[in-house]
């Protein structure tokens, strides 16, 4: 009897002390940085303090109708698995002396699980680039920063806010970044002076894998999306680009061997751009390297007043005399321009596209379902491109 009681008591104590897993999820920590309320007060330290408190899986909120003045680089170090909820205005200082030579305005380095978004769509990040446009017009050596500079890390989501007046490239992704998604963004650069907002690429996608851009509009004065060396598995869908240099590979091969591969663009509207889609590679010789472009497709592209619908430049950055001696050796494999329609500008009328493959390279390029018109003529035939020595082998003409 004594043994039985002891056993029962032991079991009862064990049962009383054991607790099952909790069904209650812990709430994310939420921080709202205190804004200084004046452009003379740098709000970056307050934001960094909030990241320190809430950056590990929490949320940092910039409320609607609030203004934060960022007079120095905002480094998001420590923001792991966290969210920046931008409903108000983040405005960078226009001090060109401070920004000269600095790479990033918002620095995202080796961060995993970062989300930057606006729930309301009212959020704005203002690069305040007018002074940079004016200074660069006077001094082309002026070294301008990029508002959102991402190197390394992964599982990054950026969505549903406006990024305006970047001094330089709007968004840069490189350094082995993987799984980055940009959606429902609005990027625009406008100068109030005669000095254009030069080099304001919308997105520069360099060394990275599995980057997606969708539902986005870009109005700028350079590439809408540039596929830079090391770009691999990039998808761009439902994008509208105005005033740009196109959805472009390159430039590649300036001083090293460069590769871009596995890119798909589908569903783009290109308005008043120098070209809608294209490739830019340096020729052979000198310090130039080998350019390799593999498995890149542009599909269902609508042209509105673009100078060229499609363009391949295999003698980029050098003059014709140089390229006669050093014809292009770029390797193009599995390149497809599919389903292009619309009307070009009158700049090259009746020519609507210019495809130039170098003699010493490979030119596996196809153009199908091409119905782009020049202002003076009808639709062009489908085209297939092969190599020819440093000449425009194949021009898409209205017929």
From Swiss-Prot:
InterPro entries: Glyco_hydro_28 (IPR000743), PbH1 (IPR006626), Pectin_lyas_fold (IPR012334), Pectin_lyase_fold/virulence (IPR011050)
GO MF term set: polygalacturonase activity
Enzyme Commission number(s) of this protein: 3.2.1.-
Enzymatic class: hydrolase
Keyword NADP on entry: no
Pfam families, per database record: Glyco_hydro_28
UniProt-annotated glycosylation sites, renumbered to this chain: 295, 382
Keywords: Carbohydrate metabolism, Cell wall biogenesis/degradation, Glycoprotein, Glycosidase, Hydrolase, Polysaccharide degradation, Repeat, Secreted, Signal
A single GO BP: cell wall organization
Annotated catalytic residues: 222, 245
GO CC annotation: extracellular region
Coiled coil: none
Signal peptide: 1-19
Protein family: Belongs to the glycosyl hydrolase 28 family.
Name of the protein in question: Probable endo-xylogalacturonan hydrolase A
